[in-house]
C-alpha cells in the first residue's frame, strides 16, 4: 500500500517525476453528459483522435480533434486551435486535458476497447453505433 501525501509540494513533485505509464492515467478528461449516460463512466484517458470541446480559457467553446498528446508536459493539441508566431508559422496551442470535455471517443484502438470492456461496456454495440 502506498501512502499519499497531502502536501501540495509533494503532489507537484509527483507530477514532475511521474513515470510515463502513470502520466497517461493522470491525463484523463471528463466525458460529455451524453457519453456519460451512454457508457456509464465519468472520465477516460485522452488519446489522439478523440473529439473534444474546450470548456475553459481563451478558446472556450472551440471543438476539434486531438492531434497530439504530450505526456511530458501534460498538454494536448487540438486541431483548429493555433497561434501564429512572429515569422508567420502556425503552432498548436497546448491545452491541459482537464480543461476539455470529450464529445466523441476514438474507438478504433484495441486498448481503448479493452479498457471500456473492463469498465462494463459492450464494445461491439458501440462500434456498430459509431459507424
Curated annotation (Swiss-Prot):
CDD domains linked: KOW_RPL26
Gene3D superfamilies named among the record's database cross-references: 2.30.30.30
Ribonucleoprotein found in the keyword field: yes
Xref: Pfam families: KOW (PF00467), Ribosomal_L26 (PF16906)
Gene Ontology annotations for the cellular component aspect, listed alphabetically: cytosolic large ribosomal subunit
InterPro entries named among the record's database cross-references: KOW, Rib_uL2_dom2, Ribosomal_uL24_CS, Ribosomal_uL24_euk/arc, Ribosomal_uL24_KOW, Translation_prot_SH3-like_sf
GO biological processes: cytoplasmic translation; ribosomal large subunit biogenesis
Highest rank taxon of the organism: Archaea
Swiss-Prot/TrEMBL keywords: Ribonucleoprotein, Ribosomal protein, RNA-binding, rRNA-binding
GO molecular function: RNA binding; rRNA binding; structural constituent of ribosome
Assembly mode: Part of the 50S ribosomal subunit.
Classification via PANTHER family: 60S RIBOSOMAL PROTEIN L26 FAMILY MEMBER
Family stated for the protein in its record: Belongs to the universal ribosomal protein uL24 family.
The protein's name: Large ribosomal subunit protein uL24
Organism annotation: Korarchaeum cryptofilum (strain OPF8)
Gene designation per UniProt: rpl24
